[in-house]
């Protein structure tokens, strides 16, 4: 193929190829040429133009296929536009000659067609350059058309369209000729020709004024004729033509009088009348022929009506939303008049009426629902409301008129009913779509919307009553706050008007519809409504027999209410189940004998009532089983079963009842049968086992009954066909935007579409996806559907013999019927058989050989049926039969049977049926073995090339695609030949056969999937395959059919998945963007599915290509939004107007992927998009309020720019719907989350501003804070409740992410501070009385987050938001009864708990701040101002909360008590309070539990803090209220009047203690994987707070089992949660438990001492763990549990501490390591706990644990003793030294019973520390300073007998000596500091050996430094520490030795002095040393004056030096204290001050 990539065709290469390859080669060359010509230099093209034209014309003569000729024509046109146009006329003449040729042979046809296409392309591209001779060309083409076949006519029409496009107004001379030709083609028998003619006329009307002026009526009539017998594509094309022409007629500015063309003005009324005439009378009506309009007797065919319906939509869409707003009244009036009494012909039969109503609803939905913004929709709803009122008044006047002559007849009532049905359905749809934004509409008293809808609930027509009920359903779904009031109103009217038949039917339907809406309203309805409804239903059923006029209505209404009640689910129904089952039992006779008696009584009417009642009962039970599965226990099933046999018996008697009482019972009997079948389908077959044979016979009779309708196929069969197979059938079976109206064309003209009045029970069922109003089919069709489904179940359950009998019966029925009747029976039987096979396969059963034979015979007959849908269903059954048989031989036999049929048959029916059967076999059995695969492919190859029948080709290719899919790797050997076949067909099949191209596309897709990743290969064969795939895609992309283009995109998507490098992303994205707004739903879906895949990997590239396409502007078809807002904005705009849910989901996912990949990089673009969407509708006063607030804040540079944006530019998003705005708000949150994982500067304004200055392209989120706040504000204050929730969510995210960011311009402040007013304004509306609870709950969360964030420090500002919480608290104090009764009780629970949770969060933060403030007061000294501000803020917040704390504490404890009850296991359910808890009712406990789970943790923490603050004693409380479970009556009131025993305060405290502890332990015990970090932390902090107070500590300390249990729970938490925060908090609780135990032990010891007297101390019992034996029992010991937990923490951080690991090979040589900060803190906390343990033990017990504690402490020291700069000690070393000191100073070390053992163990420990110096196996040497410090701690903290043992003491001295001789000055210095402490130790036995051994070394060290002078600060510090050490020695020396020491010290000090000269030039180090030495001398002189004088006298040199120094430093001498610098040095160098463990 590379040879094809040249400017001239490589003829040599192409001639060497076979026919198929040559066609491919030429096509590839033409594709390449198209791109090359546009990119090549004009001169180079002209140079080779002549040759190129010759080559192209030669190809023209070689019979090119359709895609090739199209590409050839384009290339020729581009060539002339780029090169010279000199020879263009010559080329045109050649084309004309080819067209004139008399050769009519089929082989010459492609050449003629190619010439036609070339002419069109040349004129389109070159336009007016060719204007001279175009008339000849047009005349020639039109002449050729007269003898052309359909393909020729098709191409000629498209060619004329191209000529008109190119020439524009210059083509005027030929306009009439073209118009005439196109007129005839518009009614052509070929649908493709009609489409082409419509396109041609659409182009013509741009310039031909007569089309939309003088000839407008004839154009309309022509279009109406074109609709007759049309297909979907024709209706789309022609309706576009008609709608556009009429829109032009209305809006066009007509030329003046001087114009040559006379033009007639056409008014809107005329245009609407014209369309109306077409709708009502088809093509027989004319604009001016009013007489003819009155005659129209014949019914208009449905396809004309559907076409006109689409034309209406195109007409209004072309004029646009703004036009519709202006002309709304006229338009609405006209559309509704189409089904009014002024046009009775349209609705003369029920079938016609239903179809017309559908069309009118579609027009209204597509225009009012699709084109208008929310404001205009509200106006439209008002207009509809007025129409309803007008009709209602007319109806009322007519019905109340006493004059019989003037009263409306029943036909008039029937006529007006259809207008009302359409109006009410559209009103419901509008409100449903508006959601809560429709609130102003319902509140507008002048409109009276609710009154008008409720008033028509009493309309005489059942259709209107049901439509009104459905409208109420829509209102309730849209505005949940209206649900309960509407329900109350309808129930009230039902109770009052129960003697009116219309009222009973109407209001029961309304109640049922409202109950159906409850599932869509998360807040629900009050639980008590169920009881009221059940009572009314019972009353209706019981009173039905009292009044025969109302019997039927009351019976229907009663059961409808019961059935609808079931949708409320088990929680409600469980309370009424007994009553329902009783009603069910009573409705059927108790025995067969009673049924027989019944038959002999009554009349037609009583039987009608009976059947309706029983059908209703069956429906109610079906509803119960569907919606209350949880209640379907074995016991309930047993109670349901008794009436079933009787119900089945009645089924068998129906035919005789019908004979007896007449045909009036026909419909009730059908409905009864349908209801019974539906119920039996839901029940397990075992439950009606005894009746199976009877049921089966009845079903067989039902399926073969003589009066069944023929049109059931379209209802029954699609569900039984595979969805993929439906694509090859009628396009009507595919999903389209027009499905709602196109559906009716599937049914025959004699069959009605679905409509609500056919089954009133469907009014409460869940909405069918994508449909607004339920559309149940007529009972006659529905019963067949149910019967065939039940047949599958029953036939699979009966025994084999019974099956054989029934199947033979069915087979005979088919044989004994003829014609259409036979088809109908066959259809029913096949659907039943399909259901049987489906059920058998699903239940893994099998069929016997005889049954298989019979099934095969039945299916084989259907496989050759003339009905395509039946053939399709039969092929599915064929494959399922093989699947069920699961027998290779049987399957092979089936395949062989099809092969034989295909080889012999020549008719289309057999060939299509059996080819699909082969494909289905492959699909279900994964291929039928390699031996059959080749035969199958061979047969399908042959069939797919049968050009005489496009149907055969389509089915065969579809079957081939199934074969490829299922064969998998086995197919690889056939890939090349199949691909060659596909490409050959793609290049040759005419474009008019779009269905063949679609099947080819599916084959190509299957091939690409089979090849998979192999397509990435680089070898020649793979490259050739890939090129062929791409070529195939290119052919399909260029096909005019949208569904073929969808296949092309799908193939390219697959190719991109497997070989992304080889797919041209630019052209693919271009193709996707162009088709983004295609009128074809399946194409839009393919586009979005592909885009979604692309952006997952290459979002930025896709976005860039889209922008390039928009800039290029060559493709006008690309969405205009692309130019303004890029692909992202175009997708958002598409999301706003798209109605298909799966497509919307794809759009959302695509945008999410793009946002994830690009939001951080394109921050401004994304935020602007979101802001534009949110601001486009923010036209409420609230928004202006933000702007004024912002203006007061002054200029803030970049941030504020958005707030002052002028709105002079038009919005790219006009009136976006609320759902789009919610999505935009969600995107804002996602953007913030994305930025969190990106650059730190996104949340640091100073850094962001600095980086922005550095590079202006940098963009950071923090710079857009004003935008974020504004967007959150706009959303939070919208009319839409969903958007308000999203806005509050966004605000919450903004507060949490930005609260801590400091304001660089105002230190001490944060950037969010300036938005206080905005936050307050956004929150305030959420606290009004009419706000739904979910919004208030979310607002409470935002309030608490705002207060807790610390943004606001000023109390007056804080009080504004605080006041909102106060108002909520006041509201909930009244308890659950007083809260809103609009919603379910669980909604009140949610609101109450949200308020309490918010207060809890605020209280927790207030206490925390107060605590921090108090600590700050202790530790720091701040300036007076900052102290004052901080204290006022910290204390002020606490004071604000404390005002309400008395109330809050009670509510918190009540909520916790509720939570504790709700979390009890199920076995305690019987013990729960029957009335529920404080904040929930027993009935709603299940749903309430979820709300408690969200809130309990913070409430628990707050309650624990409150109890801590009161010390468990509430000063305001008598101790009686909260000692027992809080009930609604006692929650906030005084003591109960029941006389219950008053508990003591002690009991109250105990209850509270156990409540807090119990909830905490229960939660921590069984932590679920989804338990949040916040909940666990809150729980642990609650325990910490609890244990901060003495009384709870005493409880824990005195109950050892409780302490152990709590420790075990904490141990589990530490094991299961890795979070350091959780582990630290757990350790803090452990520490508190140990402290509690210590306190308890101390108290017991003190008590014992006091009680027994001090004199008897020796005989005191031992307290503490271990008692006298020292034994610690695991599971019974608090200390042991603590040790386990601490070991767990330490070993996790330092695995080397594990004794097993330490003993393993290589385990000993470990390198000391530094832990991370979190790990260090954990280790320190564990060590601190270890230090406390000995105090909890008895002396013997302490001996037991001491080795472990010492091992762990010294282990930590050893493993973490890492050298740090400056001799610092690591955090863990410091902790281990502190622990060591705590242990060494423990009283147990001195206790008589343990002293000896402790001494021995401590000596061992010291020896272990000393051993640490000896590294094992080359491990790194540990830090000497750390180990020396540990040794020093031992020397100073233990009794002398531990450390004065010679062997230990000598080793210690050696270590110090070695350290003094270290080369590291820091080590020497630190050693001097440690020795300073030892030398001063008061006991000589300890200190003297060190002085004797080390003093001389120190003196030598100082003398050495004195000689060479210190060089740096470290040596200076060493020198100073050495001098201090000698000074200390002087101080402690005995008098007789002191002189010697002073004499030794003075020369050293004096040697450091500098004289006056040297002082000036001294370094800072020598100067500091001079000052230090001089200061020391000044102190020693007076203190030891005699020695001082003696030394001075004996050494004149020293004296002279001293004097010189003093003289040179007189200033220093005069100042008594040393310099500040020296002071600091002295302070810094003392380790005692740094760490306090010595």
Swiss-Prot record:
Coiled coil: none
A Pfam family it matches: HEAT_HEATR5A
Keywords carried by this UniProt record: Phosphoprotein, Repeat
Disordered as annotated region, ranges: 1646-1668
Residue windows of the HEAT repeats: 850-887, 1082-1119
Modified residues (Phosphoserine): 1647
Presence of the UniProt keyword Cell membrane in the record: no
Disulfide partners: none
Family recorded in the similarity comment: Belongs to the HEATR5 family.
Protein name, as recorded: HEAT repeat-containing protein 5A
């Amino acid at each position: 193929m590379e040879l094809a990539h040249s400017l001239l065709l490589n003829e040599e290469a192409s001639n060497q190829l076979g026919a198929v390859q040559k066609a491919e080669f030429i096509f590839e060359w033409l594709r390449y040429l198209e791109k090359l010509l546009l990119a090549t230099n004009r001169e180079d093209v002209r140079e080779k133009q002549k040759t190129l034209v010759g080559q192209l014309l030669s190809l023209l003569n070689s019979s090119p296929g359709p895609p090739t000729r199209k590409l050839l024509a384009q290339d020729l046109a581009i060539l002339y536009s780029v090169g010279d146009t000199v020879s263009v006329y010559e080329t045109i003449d050649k084309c004309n000659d080819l067209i004139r040729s008399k050769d009519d042979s089929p082989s010459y046809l492609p050449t003629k067609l190619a010439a036609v296409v070339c002419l069109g392309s040349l004129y389109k591209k070159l336009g007016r350059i060719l204007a001279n001779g175009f008339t000849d060309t047009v005349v020639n083409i039109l002449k050729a058309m007269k003898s052309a076949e359909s393909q020729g006519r098709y191409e000629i029409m498209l060619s004329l369209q191209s000529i008109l496009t190119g020439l524009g107004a210059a083509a005027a001379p030929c306009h009439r000729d073209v118009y005439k030709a196109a007129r005839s083609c518009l009614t052509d028998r070929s649908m493709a020709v009609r489409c082409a003619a419509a396109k041609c006329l659409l182009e013509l009307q741009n310039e031909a004024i007569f089309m939309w002026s003088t000839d407008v009526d004839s154009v309309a009539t022509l279009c109406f004729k074109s609709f007759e017998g049309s297909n979907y594509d024709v209706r789309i094309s022609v309706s576009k033509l008609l709608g556009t022409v009429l829109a032009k007629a209305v809006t066009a500015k007509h030329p003046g009088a001087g114009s040559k063309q006379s033009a007639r003005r056409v008014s809107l009324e005329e245009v609407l009348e014209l369309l109306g005439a077409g709708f009502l009378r088809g093509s027989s009506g004319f604009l001016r022929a009013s007489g003819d309009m009155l005659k129209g007797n014949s019914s208009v065919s449905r396809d004309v009506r559907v076409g006109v319906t689409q034309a209406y939509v195109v007409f209004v869409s072309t004029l646009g939303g703004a036009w519709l707003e202006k002309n709304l009244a006229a338009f609405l009036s006209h559309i509704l008049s189409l089904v009014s009494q002024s046009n009775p012909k349209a609705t003369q039969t029920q079938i016609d009426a239903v179809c017309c109503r559908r069309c009118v609803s579609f027009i209204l939905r597509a225009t009012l629902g699709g084109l208008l913004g929310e404001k205009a929709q509200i106006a439209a709803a008002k207009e509809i409301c007025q129409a309803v009122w007008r009709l209602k008044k007319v109806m009322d006047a007519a019905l109340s008129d006493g004059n019989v002559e003037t009263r409306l007849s029943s036909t008039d009532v029937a006529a007006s009913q259809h207008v009302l049905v359409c109006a009410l359905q559209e009103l419901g749809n509008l409100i449903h779509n508006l959601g809560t934004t429709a609130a102003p509409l319902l509140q507008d008293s002048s409109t009276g919307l609710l009154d008008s809808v409720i008033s028509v609930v009493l309309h005489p027509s059942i259709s209107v009553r049901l439509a009104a009920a459905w409208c109420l359903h829509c209102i309730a779904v849209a505005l949940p706050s209206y649900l309960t009031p509407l329900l109350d109103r309808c129930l009230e009217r039902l109770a009052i008007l129960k003697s009116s038949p219309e009222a009973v039917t109407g209001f029961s339907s309304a109640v049922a519809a409202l109950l159906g809406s409850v599932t869509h309203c998360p807040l629900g309805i009050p639980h008590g409504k169920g009881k009221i409804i059940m009572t009314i239903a019972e009353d209706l059923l019981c009173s039905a027999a009292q009044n025969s006029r109302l019997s039927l209505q009351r019976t229907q209404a009663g059961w409808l209410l019961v059935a609808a009640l079931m949708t409320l689910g088990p929680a409600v129904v469980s309370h009424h189940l007994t009553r329902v089952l009783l009603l069910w039992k009573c409705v059927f006779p108790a025995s067969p004998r009673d049924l027989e008696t019944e038959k002999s009584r009554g009349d037609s009417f009583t039987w009608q009532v009976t059947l309706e009642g029983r059908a209703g009962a069956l429906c109610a039970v079906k509803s119960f089983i569907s919606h209350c599965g949880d209640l379907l226990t074995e016991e309930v099933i047993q109670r349901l079963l008794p009436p079933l046999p009787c119900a089945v018996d009645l089924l068998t008697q129906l035919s005789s009842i019908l004979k007896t009482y007449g045909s009036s019972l026909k419909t009730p009997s059908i409905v009864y049968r349908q209801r019974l079948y539906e119920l039996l389908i839901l029940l397990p077959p075992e439950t009606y086992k005894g009746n199976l044979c009877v049921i089966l016979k009845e079903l067989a009779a039902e399926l073969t009954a003589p009066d069944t309708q023929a049109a059931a196929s379209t209802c029954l069969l699609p569900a039984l066909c595979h969805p993929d197979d439906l694509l090859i059938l009628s396009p009507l079976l595919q999903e389209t935007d027009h499905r709602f109206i196109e559906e009716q064309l599937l049914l025959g003209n004699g069959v009605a579409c679905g409509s609500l009045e056919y089954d009133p029970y469907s009014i409460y069922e869940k909405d069918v996806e994508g449909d607004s109003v339920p559309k149940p089919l007529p009972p006659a069709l529905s019963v067949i559907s149910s019967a065939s489904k039940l047949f599958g179940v029953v036939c699979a359950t009966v025994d084999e013999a019974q099956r054989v009998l029934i199947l033979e019966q069915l087979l005979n029925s088919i044989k004994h019927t003829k014609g259409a009747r036979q088809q109908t029976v066959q259809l029913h039987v096949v659907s039943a058989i399909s259901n049987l096979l489906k059920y058998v396969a699903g239940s893994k059963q099998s069929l016997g050989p005889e049954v298989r034979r019979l099934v095969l015979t039945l299916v084989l007959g259907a496989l050759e049926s003339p009905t395509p849908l039946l053939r399709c269903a039969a092929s599915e059954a064929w494959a399922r039969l093989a699947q069920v048989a699961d027998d290779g031989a049987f399957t092979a036999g089936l395949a062989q049977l099809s092969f034989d049929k295909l080889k012999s048959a020549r008719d289309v029916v057999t060939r299509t049926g059996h080819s699909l059967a082969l494909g289905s076999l492959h699909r279900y059995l994964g291929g039928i073995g390699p031996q059959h695969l080749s035969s199958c492919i061979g047969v399908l190859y042959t069939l797919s090339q049968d050009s005489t029948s496009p149907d055969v080709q389509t089915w065969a290719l579809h079957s081939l695609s199934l074969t490829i899919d299922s064969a998998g790797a086995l197919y690889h050997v056939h890939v090349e030949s199949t691909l060659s076949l596909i490409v050959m067909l793609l290049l040759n099949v005419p474009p008019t056969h779009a269905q063949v191209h679609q099947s080819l596309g599916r084959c190509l897709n299957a091939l690409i999937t089979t090849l998979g990743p192999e397509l990435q290969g680089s070898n020649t064969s793979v490259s050739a395959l890939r090129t062929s795939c791409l070529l195939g895609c290119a052919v399909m992309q260029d096909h005019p059919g949208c569904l073929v283009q969808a296949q092309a995109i799908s193939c390219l998507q697959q190719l991109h998945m497997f070989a992304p490098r080889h797919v041209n992303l630019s052209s693919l994205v271009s193709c996707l963007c162009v088709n983004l707004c295609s009128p074809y739903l399946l194409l839009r879906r393919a586009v979005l599915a592909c885009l979604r895949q692309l952006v997952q990997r290459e979002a930025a590239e896709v976005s860039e290509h889209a922008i390039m396409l928009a800039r290029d502007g060559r493709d006008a078809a690309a969405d205009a939004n692309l130019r303004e807002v890029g692909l992202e904005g175009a997708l958002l705009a598409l999301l706003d107007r798209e109605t298909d849910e799966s497509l919307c989901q794809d759009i959302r996912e695509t945008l999410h992927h793009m946002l994830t990949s690009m939001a951080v990089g394109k921050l401004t673009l994304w935020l602007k998009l979101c802001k534009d969407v949110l601001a486009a509708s923010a036209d409420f006063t609230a928004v202006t309020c933000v702007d004024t607030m912002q203006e007061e804040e002054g200029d803030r540079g970049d941030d504020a720019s958005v707030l002052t944006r002028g709105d002079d530019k038009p919005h790219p998003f006009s009136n976006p719907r609320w759902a789009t705005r919610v999505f935009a708000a969600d995107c804002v949150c996602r953007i913030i989350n994305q930025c969190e994982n990106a650059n730190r500067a996104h949340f640091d304004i100073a850094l962001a501003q600095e980086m922005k200055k550095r590079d202006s392209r940098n963009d950071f989120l923090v710079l857009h804070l004003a935008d974020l706040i504004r967007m959150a504000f706009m959303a939070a204050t919208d009319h839409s409740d969903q958007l308000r929730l999203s806005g509050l969510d966004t605000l919450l995210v903004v507060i949490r992410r930005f609260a801590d960011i400091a304001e660089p311009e105002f230190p001490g402040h944060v950037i969010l501070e300036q938005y206080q007013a905005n936050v307050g304004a956004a929150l305030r509306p959420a606290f009004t009385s009419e706000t739904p609870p979910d919004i208030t709950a979310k607002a409470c969360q935002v309030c608490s987050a705002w207060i807790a964030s610390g943004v606001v420090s000023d109390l007056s500002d804080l009080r504004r938001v605080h006041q909102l919480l106060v108002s909520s608290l006041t509201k909930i104090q009244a308890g659950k009864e007083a809260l809103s009764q609009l919603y379910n009780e669980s909604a009140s629970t949610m609101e109450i708990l949200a308020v309490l949770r918010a207060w809890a969060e605020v209280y927790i933060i207030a206490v925390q701040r107060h605590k921090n403030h108090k600590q700050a007061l202790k530790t720091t000294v701040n300036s007076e101002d900052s102290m004052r501000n901080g204290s006022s803020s910290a204390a002020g917040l606490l004071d604000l909360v404390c005002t309400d704390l008395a109330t809050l504490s009670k509510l918190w404890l009540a909520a916790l008590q509720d939570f504790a009850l709700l979390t009890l296991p199920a076995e305690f359910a019987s013990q729960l309070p029957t009335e529920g808890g404080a904040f929930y009712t027993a009935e709603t406990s299940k749903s309430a539990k979820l709300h408690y789970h969200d809130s309990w943790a913070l409430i628990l923490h707050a309650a624990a803090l409150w109890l801590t603050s009161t010390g468990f004693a509430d000063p305001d409380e008598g101790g009686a209220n909260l000692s027992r479970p809080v009930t609604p009556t006692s929650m906030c009131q005084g003591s109960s009047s029941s006389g219950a025993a008053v508990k003591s305060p002690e009991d109250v405290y105990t209850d509270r203690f156990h409540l807090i502890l119990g909830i905490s332990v229960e939660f921590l015990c069984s932590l679920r994987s989804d338990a949040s970090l916040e909940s666990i932390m809150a729980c642990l902090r609650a325990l910490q707070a609890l244990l901060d107070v003495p009384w709870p500590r005493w409880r824990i300390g005195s109950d050892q089992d409780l302490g152990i249990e709590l420790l075990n729970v904490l141990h589990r938490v530490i094991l299961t949660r890795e979070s350091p925060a959780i582990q630290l908090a757990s350790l803090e609780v452990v520490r508190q438990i140990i402290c509690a135990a210590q306190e308890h032990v101390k108290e017991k010891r003190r008590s014992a001492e006091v009680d027994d007297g001090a004199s008897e101390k020796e005989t005191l019992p031992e307290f503490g763990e271990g008692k006298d034996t020292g034994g610690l029992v695991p599971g019974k010991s608090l200390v042991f549990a603590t040790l386990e937990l601490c070991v767990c923490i330490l070993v996790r951080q330092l695995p080397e501490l594990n004794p097993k690991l330490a003993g393993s090979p290589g385990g000993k040589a470990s390198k000391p390591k530094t832990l991370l900060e979190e790990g260090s803190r954990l280790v320190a906390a564990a060590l601190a706990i270890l230090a406390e343990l000995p105090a909890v033990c008895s002396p013997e017990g302490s001996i037991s644990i001491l080795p472990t504690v010492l091992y762990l402490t010294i282990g930590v020291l050893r493993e973490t003793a890492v050298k740090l700069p400056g001799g610092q000690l690591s955090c863990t070393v410091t902790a281990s030294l502190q622990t060591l000191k705590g242990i060494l100073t423990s009283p147990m070390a001195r206790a008589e019973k343990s002293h000896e053992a402790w001494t021995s163990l401590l000596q061992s420990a010291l020896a272990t520390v000393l051993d640490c110096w000896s590294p094992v196996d080359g491990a790194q040497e540990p830090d000497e300073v750390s180990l020396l410090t540990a040794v020093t701690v031992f020397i100073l903290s233990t009794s002398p007998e531990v450390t004065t043992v010679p062997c230990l003491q000598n080793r210690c001295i050696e270590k110090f000596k070695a350290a003094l001789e270290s080369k590291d000055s820091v080590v020497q210095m630190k050693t001097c500091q440690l020795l300073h402490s030892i030398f001063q130790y008061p006991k000589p036995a300890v200190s003297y050996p060190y002085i004797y051994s080390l003093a001389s070394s120190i003196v030598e060290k100082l003398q050495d430094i004195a000689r060479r002078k210190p060089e740096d600060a470290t040596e200076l510090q060493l020198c100073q520490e050495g001098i201090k050490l000698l000074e200390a020695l002087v101080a402690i020396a005995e008098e007789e030795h002191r002189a010697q020491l002073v004499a030794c010290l003075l020369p050293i000090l004096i040697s450091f002095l500098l004289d006056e000269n040297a002082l000036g030039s001294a370094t800072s180090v020598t100067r500091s040393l001079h000052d230090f030495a001089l200061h020391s001398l000044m102190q020693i002189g007076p203190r030891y004056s005699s020695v001082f004088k003696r030394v001075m006298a004996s050494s004149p040199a020293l004296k002279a030096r001293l004097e010189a120094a003093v003289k040179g430093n007189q200033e220093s001498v005069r100042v008594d204290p040393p310099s500040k610098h020296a002071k600091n040095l002295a302070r810094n160098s003392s380790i005692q001050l740094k760490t306090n463990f010595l």
